[in-house]
Design a protein with these regions (language model features):
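Membrane-integral, polyisoprenol-dependent glycosyltransferases
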Residues: 2-7, 15-396, 571-579
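Membrane-embedded architecture of ER/inner-membrane glycosylation machinery
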Residues: 4-7, 17-25, 32-33, 215, ...
């Protein structure tokens, strides 16, 4: 894909201030990591097995133990729960409020998992959040494997494995796999579509594939496109469409598009996506398109929504954290990519990356995960340059490998500091994991010039996996203060009531509705007082700033109630400390 000279030589090791013993031990560890890659490149089955194992190591921590996360995850999960409860699989609602911002794809996937678990007798399936996360986990793992598959159109198997490892250890994907919403699954569909489109594009000037391969490639492309549309509407069309337009304009030819069987493909796309769109139009009229296109899509393009505005350059700045550890090599790979920009493979990957990135930087509403579908292109570009041994050797760029050490150290300080300040605990289980991550990051940086980029990247991947295990497997689940809804629902379950009911004032996050039940009333102080007056086993969760008003309303109505525990917590959706008082009704007045 690119050509160049080795990025370093063993002679550079003499400049490093490390002992011979330490170097030998580090190189032995590096050889062990390299042996794993050597094993993986032996066959496609081995490569898939290694990537699957690494992905599971990075993606499973916290998957089962972290409570519902406000707000998006809880909103998606609650809407799915209502589908299962009501048997209504066309209309999308959060309590009585319609949710027409996104199509139905993710809700159907989550509902399928939850209904299957319920049918198998899984207890409390409707309120078990990790069941709703399974599609995201599958999407994230599939995205890693599909990155490997897509990369094989451009680079060697070894480089494709490295690209997959970069995605498996990527910070942003490591977060999205944990959240029960659309983005990990969307990434999967984009990588599948772009991998198929790459093969169609790169067939130009080569021996044509047999008819079976051509039709299979086209089927993958159009099926992935349809799935992406059902998951998140036009975003996948933007990524694929802008890439295709860029290639057509640069090459002044669109002949390769015929390899994707566009006529049959469009018919297949319509067969897959139109039934639900017609059903929702029949149910809601033009309300769905008014909210999803007019309110959500155009609203995000033309104005910042929900305080998520940021200037152009936002994604570029975040990239160095959200694509860590792979991002550390991006600057070193850029000169080689630029030199090879006219090669078909590089041209395609840049068309995948650049146009959509520029559009997203210009859109007013910005969220970190919007650029996730573009990260596989970056991973493949970097992996190709590593494989060609063409990374830049300019000292000021090489010094950037310090970032491999900085991130795990910063994560250690932040994570253990949060345990001490918020959780008031030492978090001893996290210390060896974070320490190991810092050591691997240090060695990745310090021995980069001695051992080369591949060894450095593999050490950094190990650092990323250890960091993920510590942060998501130990630290975050220990911070119960970040998840007050789980604490409040625990109070309900321990109340001795068979069917407790709840109302909430002030603190009204979606996770409370998901865990406490769809009938949970989100109201004001008067509504809470009237709610308690309605019978026994009723609970009111009142944020401290509303407590005086509630007491006055309850007294005026003659409501009899008892005071329960008070909860000091942090509202994770806005980062603010909150205190919630619990009140329980005493019969009807």
């Amino acid at each position: 894909m690119v050509s160049g000279q080795p990025e370093s030589t063993p002679d550079r090791a003499r400049d490093m201030v490390v002992t011979v013993d330490n170097k030998e031990r580090s190189r032995a560890a590096a050889r062990s990591l390299k042996t794993i890659v050597d094993f993986a490149v032996g066959s496609h089955a081995r490569a898939v097995a290694v990537l699957l194992a690494v992905a599971l190591l990075g993606f499973l921590p916290g998957f089962f133990s972290i409570p519902p996360i406000d707000r998006d995850e809880a909103r998606f999960a609650q809407a799915t729960k209502q589908m299962v409860e009501s048997g209504e699989y066309v209309d999308i609602r959060f309590q009585d409020e319609v949710r027409y911002k996104k199509p139905v794809g993710i809700y159907w996937l989550q509902a399928g998992v939850v209904k299957t678990a319920s049918a198998l007798g899984f207890p409390h399936a409707l309120t078990t959040i990790w069941l709703y996360r399974i599609p995201s986990l599958i999407g994230a793992i599939a995205a890693v494997l599909l990155t490997y598959w897509a990369a094989l159109a451009f680079v060697s198997r070894r480089a494709a494995v490295l690209a997959g490892l970069m995605m498996a250890s990527c910070v942003l994907l490591g977060v999205e796999r944990l959240i029960a919403k659309t983005d990990a699954m969307l990434l999967m569909t984009v990588v599948a579509a772009m991998g198929a489109m790459a093969r169609a594009y790169l067939w130009q000037g080569r021996e044509r594939p047999d008819a079976s391969s051509a039709w299979t490639t086209a089927a993958v492309f159009w099926t992935a496109l349809a799935a992406g549309v059902l998951l998140k509407g036009p975003l996948i069309v933007m990524v694929v469409g802008l890439a295709a337009i860029a290639l057509i304009v640069v090459d002044r030819s669109a002949s390769w598009v015929l390899s994707l069987k566009p006529l049959a493909g469009i018919v297949w796309l319509a067969i897959l996506v139109l039934p639900w769109f017609l059903a929702i139009i029949g149910r809601a009229g033009d309300a769905f398109f008014a909210e999803s296109v007019g309110g959500d899509l155009f609203g995000k393009v033309l104005a910042s929504q929900e305080s998520h505005g940021a200037p152009p350059g936002y994604y570029f700045i975040l990239f160095w954290v959200t694509f860590w550890p792979g991002a550390t090599l991006a600057a070193l790979a850029t000169p080689a990519v630029w030199r090879a920009r006219h090669e078909p493979a590089i041209k395609f990957l840049l068309a995948w990356l650049v146009p959509s990135w520029l559009v997203l930087e210009l859109v007013m509403t910005k969220l970190p995960h919007y650029v996730l579908p573009l990260y596989p292109a970056i991973a493949i570009l970097i992996a190709g340059v590593i494989d060609a041994r063409a990374l830049s050797r300019k000292p000021f760029l090489v010094r950037g490998t310090l970032w491999w050490f900085v991130v795990p150290v910063a994560a250690s300080v932040a994570g253990i500091g949060a345990l001490a300040v918020i959780g008031r605990q030492f978090g001893l289980l996290a210390w060896p994991l974070m320490g190991g991550a810092a050591v691997m990051g240090f060695l990745a940086w310090r021995l980069y010039q001695a051992d080369g980029a591949e060894h450095g990247l593999l050490r950094a991947v190990a650092a990323a996996i250890l960091t993920a295990i510590a942060m998501f497997g130990v630290i975050v689940p220990s911070l119960g203060q970040l998840f007050p809804s789980a604490t409040l629902v625990r109070i309900l379950r321990e109340s001795g009531c068979a069917h407790p009911q709840a109302a909430a004032v002030g603190y009204q996050e979606p996770s409370l509705v998901f865990l406490a039940g769809t009938p949970t009333r989100l109201t004001d102080t008067l509504g809470a007082a009237e709610f308690l007056r309605g019978g026994e086993c009723r609970f009111a969760f009142i944020e401290a700033r509303e407590e005086r008003s509630f007491a006055q309303r309850a007294e005026a109505l003659g409501v009899r109630y008892s005071a329960g525990p008070r909860i000091d917590a942090i509202n994770i959706s806005n980062g603010r400390p909150i205190t919630i008082a619990v009140f329980r009704s005493i019969g009807s007045s």
